[in-house]
Each structure stands twice: as C-alpha cells, then as structure tokens.
C-alpha cells in the first residue's frame, strides 16, 4: 500500500483526471436513463408463478390481468355527463399513444356517477416496458407527485394503475425520498465531520468523495438497467451505502494521517503511513462487505439481485475513491487537511483528552470482564428477542402512503370491479400430449374448475381459455380479497395442495400476482439460512486473513450475529408493534420480505468495518509489545473516537433515509442504524475488550499449518520508524487548546522571514521548547495531569494552557523585532538611536519543530528568546519590552532565566569602549526598571498595579543573576 500511495501522490493530477472523466458520463446517464428502473423483479426462477406468467406471454396474448388501467373516480357532486366525459377523455388519451389499445372487460358496468369506472389497457410488442407508457399517461391526465389528475371541472379524479404505474410512481417517490434524505444527511454529516476534524477544509474531503461515489455508482447502475432488470429501490441503496461508506472510509484514513503527523512524520510520509494502515484496513473491509453482499445472489430473484448489485457497486466505488483519491487529495491539500480551526472547534477540551476517557473505560471493562460481557450479552439478547415474532410480507402498493394517488386509484378500481378483479388467480392446466380442448380432457378441466370454486375467498371462476397451441387451458379465479392480502396467500396454498388431487395426469400450476409474491417470500425464507451461513463463512475468512487469529475471527462473526439479531428485533418493535409511531414510522402488519436478507448481508459487511479497524489496530500494537491488555487498551484508546465518529455519520445517513423513505427503505434504514449503533458501542467497546481480557493469549492462537496457508498482509510489517533527528514534536497527549489558524499561518510566515534575516542561524537542542505552555508557572506535566483527571473543567479560560504553536508565534515575533531593530554582517552593527550600540557575537540559536500540519521549521530557542528580549531592553528601554520580559519569565523559575541571561556576554558585546559587560548592565536595568516611556502610561490604579508586578518579576531575575554570578 505504501508503494501504491507514493505512486498515486506522484501522479495525482492523472488520478484527478481519471475520476473526472468517470463523473461526466455518469452525470449524463443519471439525467437520461433513470426511466429503465422497474418496480417489479420479484419473479422466482423455476416457480409456478413464473411458469404461468411465461405461458401467458407466449400462448395467451389476450388473457391475464391488464398491463395498465385508467380509472375515473367521480366526486359526490358528479353527474352522468361528468363521468361520461371523463371516460371519453381517458379513452382518447389511451388511443393517442402508439401500441396502446383498450382491453374489453365483461365485468365492468357502464359509467355511473356513483361508481368509479376502469378502462383496461393492453400494450403490444412496441411497448416492452410499461413504465414509460405509464409515465406518459400520468403526465397526460395531470398526475402531480402524489396527487391525482382530474377533469377540467374537477368533479372526476383520474388515475393510472397497474404494474407500470407502480414502477413509475415508485421511481418518482425514491427520487423525492433521496433528495429529502440528502437534505437531512449532508448538514448532519458536515457537522459531525467539522466536530471531528475541527476544519471545514478537512470536513469537505469526505463529503466530496461521497458525492463522487454516489454519482459514479448511479451511472453504473443506469448502464446495467439498459441490459438487465434493476429495481427502483436500488437508487436508495446506492445513495445510502455510497454516502455512508465513502465518508467512513475517508474518515479512517484522514484520522490516521493526522495521527502520523502528530508523531512527527512529514506530510508525504504521513500519507503513505496512513494508507499502509487505515488504507489497507479500508480495502480489506470493502472486500469483506462486497463478499458478504454476494450472498444475496443465492436467493436468485431480480429485485434482490439488483439491490445487491447496486450496494456492491457502491462499496467498490467507495473503496476505490478512498484508496486512490484520498492520497491524491492529501498530497495536494496536505496543510488544509491537517490544520484545525479554533473557530469551528466547538469543545474547549482538546480532542486528545478523549483518549484518556477511553483508556479508563477499557481498563474498567477489562478489570471485570465476566460481568461486563454478561451484561452486554443480555442487552443484545433482549433486543433480539422480538425477532422471533417477525411476520414477513411483500407489497409494492403498500410502499405508498394511504393518501397517495396510486393507492387511492387502486382502491377506486377495487370499488368498481371488486378487490380481486385486477389480480385474479390464474390456474394453468397442462396436458403432456396437447389437445387441451379435446373432449377427453373436458371432464378434468371441469373438475378442476369446480374445485377452484370451493377454495376460500374465491368469488367466481371464468370459463376455460385455451392456448394458441392448444397445449394448456387457463382458468381465472377472482377473489373477494385484495391480491396482496394475507388471505389471498392462503388461497394460493390451498389451491396448490388440493388441485393436483383432482387433476389426474394433467399438470396444474397456480400463478397470478398473489402467487408471484408468495413464491418470492417462500424463496427468501427458504434461502435465508443459506445466505446466513455463506455470509458468516466469508466474514470469518476475511477476519482470519486480516487478524490471523482463529478465536478473534470466530468472536467477530458471533458478535456481528448478535448485532444483526438486535437489528431484526428493532424492526419488529418499530414497525410491527408500532412503538415509533410518534416519530412518523407507520405501523405495519408485516416486515417486507426483502429486508431481512438485505439487512443480514449489509450489516454483516458494515460491522466488519469496525471489527477490522479495531482489531487490526490492536494487533498492530500487540506485534510491538506482545502484551494483550496493553494492546487492547491502546487499540480502543486510539480508535474509539474514530469508530464513534464514523458510526455517528453512518447512523445519520441511515436515519435520514429511514425518516424520508418508503416503508421498505425505512425498514432497511432503521435496521442498519440500530445494527451500527449496537455494534459500535456495546460490541466494540464492551464485548470486544471484555472477551479479549478473558482469553488473553488465546486471542492470538493460530495453528502453524494454517499460518503457512493464510496470505500475509501488510499489518504484519511494522511501519518505518519516524526519523525525527533533532525535531521537536508536540506530544500526542498535550492537553492544550487547538491552535488558531491565524497562529499557524503567522508561524509559517515568521519562520520564513527569520530564515531570511538570520541565514547563518544554527540548530541546537531546546530544553525550553514547551516553556510557556503552562500558566501561572505550572509545569507542563502538571497541566496535563489536571486534564487527565478531569480537573480542567474547573479551570477558567484565562488559566488554560497555551498551545505550543501560540508560544512559538510569540517567540518568532520577539526574534523578528530584535533582528529588525539592528542588523549585523560580519560583525557590523547598526544601533538603535535610543540606546547604546551592541554587537552580536554569535549566530542565532534555533531549534527544529514540527507543526500539527506536518510542516517543519526553525524557531528561536527559549533561551534565545530571552536573550533577544534582554537585548531589546538594553537597546530600546521601553515599558513594552519590560512587560514582555515579565511575561516570559513568569512561565519559568527566575533561576532558569538568570542562568540564561548570565551568559549574555557570549552572545552580545558593547561597541562603545570602556562600557560595562552587557550582562552587568542588564542586571542594573532589571533591578530598577526606568523605561524611557514610563510617563506615557495610563495613571490609573490598575496600570500602576500591573507595572509594580512587572518590576517585581524583573527584580527577581536580577537578584537571581547576582546569585548566579557568585
């Protein structure tokens, strides 16, 4: 990964160009090809319903339920003339579309003002897709969003119903839902990212990658939709996964990049190190999610297959953007991605202090592992218990609100023709030798028809119709219940059990809309255990390769199963039991049958993100120390904040779709949000450390023969050590405020100016590098201890420690002031007119420091800053210099300042002959400060008190210098 990262950094403009070239056609496809998505795709290969459907298409061109229908629903004040005009208008609109004809319906009564009227339509071969025709019809009758069309006088409402209309309405709804969800998601994600990174520039990087991921994936989906069945719900899946994973993956890498910068690495090296660790974890996690989602293909239905394909594409593109675009972006905007802004850093407590909370937390958990593990497991099992009462169903119509025009149109058609008229049960009777209409088969067909009439919920059975090849007979039964009602499914089950008993040698297949849905649900229920086993095995193998531990891989799979079970339980509580009705979630009789397998594969894959990210961090530490408890504490301490932030983002994304989406999307959103929340908290932060503390060395058990078989990953190779040399690095646990961006900018500018003014400066070790970061004379370690113990909340803002960058800015300001007050070249000097002439005898002493942005630069040492300020006192004798000097010595012991200033004569000498040594003169100035501008100060009592404090501090240093001279 490090080699790949280096290549991507070098060729970053080529990387940007490649992704830009992928974006352009994706945007075009999104604008032109979205109409290819369908609301169907629930056919099951080899099922009776699909066989009947195919036979009807092949041999019964004029039979079956109408593809589309137009409905005129009169209002109470409508007249005969109004309904007649409305029906005539619908027939005229239908006749204007090529390939659309009216299908006669013998059960339809003449138009009446107290009853809706249905105009059934058929489409010929020129209209392969009913969705496009439905869109045209909806536009022509005036359907707007979820509102029906109406006649000119508004007395008759107009609707389009049928499978094509459902697809068109679902496509419009999902587009609207995605827009609503993103209006909710993006601001929340931005707020979380700004809180995490403390910088709008850094927060913009994951959002930009998320947008790129979603747009490109949508383009790929629309390309596939031109060649295969793609469900309308795939767009919601792509948007959910694309945003959540792209943001999460880039967040992992950016957080590690900043951590490597804090360790002292230069920005290019920090990028490579982040990619070799978090970048590799992202790739492994993405591959695990993709492998888990392939389990959906075992169900082998077009709808689920298309949704899995969309999710897989979203994961793959998110993984690729994170692994390729992130290094290129960091190479281009390294400083912007690294720095934090005090303006958007909302908490006064620094981010680094959070690790101490997690350190104490994991220590508390590991000291009582049995209790915490038992408590966490109990919570998960209680959450999972309602899953045993889950009822599965499937209804595209019920994905719409009850007031939606597609629902009210279907209700009007049911009122006109009966609830089961638009979805009759279709019984196909086949004879091996053909001749279905032959007299010898009439008795068999009559017996089957008689038996159908005895089935529950059957209202009428139409006379048999024969295939154009005379190989089969079709019997249509109209039910008294809606085709999507659970009672209709009972009828299908009864027919499939009873009809073969009276069919003799004939083959009986039961189809129709209800049978189609039932076959789909049965296939999902039958194959879900297989999907579970497949996904669990894939996850186990990926964890085994990543972590090289049998126990940890098994534990990871088991913990994820608990998270999935808790998510299933939440579905029952929220939707079946209606506990969240107050939040706007509808109470449903059943959970959509597509949701459990999708949630299983999705959450299994997503949970592996945190499992791999946490355990690889623990393993990385274990390889260095060999101590399990230390490795667990370190892994949780360094990754808990990242995991929590990533989980918050993912939960926000899923909740956005849950609140804005159709019931199927809402169910997926709720389940995934609960699974991620449980996994990132109860599992990763309680069960993982507790179980690892229980099993200690067994955590790393791996048979020798298996170790030789497993492929090696880069986690086993330690990162190159940071070559700091004499560079001063800000401690990772430094308890200080975030440096203001202005300070960072000024330090960079001032350091560059210092290099020009003092080109012969030398670098030395600076024991006073962090002097001034503590307040009121506190040592740095005391201030750190206060923060670690939580005392910092009681410290006023004025007493809080100062960030080293702010201190270094002040040092550079003093140095530039002194260097611009006088200049020297080869011993030459230009003296200030207000004071005696002094000559610099030795080069300026500086030290190398590393900023949080990764920049390395030279600043004056703490001792040199004191000498510069002493020089300014002697040169200008201003009250401002005395006050600055007092502030400098206030951060250290007077003896320390005296030891530095006592050696002034090695750095400066007096130009005038016969003058005293500079250190001796400085003692006199400090013992009795008499600045030349003392009369210009404010005469107030506060100013006088402050000046007396300055005199006291200067005197303490003068006394210490005299003591030093003894």
Curated annotation (Swiss-Prot):
Q: Which Gene3D superfamilies match?
A: Multidrug efflux transporter AcrB transmembrane domain (1.20.1640.10)
InterPro entries named in the record: MMPL_dom (IPR004869), Mycobact_MmpL (IPR050545), SSD (IPR000731)
Pfam families, per this entry? MMPL (PF03176)
- Report the family membership: Belongs to the resistance-nodulation-cell division (RND) (TC 2.A.6) family. MmpL subfamily.
Main localization of the protein described in the UniProt heading: membrane
What is the membrane topology listed in the Swiss-Prot or TrEMBL record? Answer: Multi-pass membrane protein
PROSITE patterns xrefs: SSD
SUPFAM superfamilies in UniProt: Multidrug efflux transporter AcrB transmembrane domain
Location(s), subcellular: Cell inner membrane
Identify one Gene Ontology CC term for this UniProt entry.
plasma membrane
Protein purpose: Part of a heme-iron acquisition system. Receives heme from the heme-binding protein Rv0203 and transports it into the mycobacterial cell. Contributes to virulence. Could also transport the mycolic acid-containing lipids monomeromycolyl diacylglycerol (MMDAG) and mycolate ester wax (WE) to the bacterial surface.
What's the protein here called? Heme uptake protein MmpL11
Q: Which residues cross the membrane?
A: 13-33, 188-208, 214-234, 235-255, 279-299, 311-331, 373-393, 527-547, 557-577, 595-615, 646-666, 668-688
Query: Which keywords does this chain's UniProt record carry?
Result: Cell inner membrane, Cell membrane, Membrane, Transmembrane, Transmembrane helix, Transport, Virulence
Q: Which organism is it from?
A: Mycobacterium tuberculosis (strain ATCC 25618 / H37Rv)
Q: What happens when the gene is disrupted?
A: Inactivation increases mouse survival. Mutants show growth patterns similar to the wild-type strain during the active growth phase, but they are attenuated for survival in the chronic stages of infection.
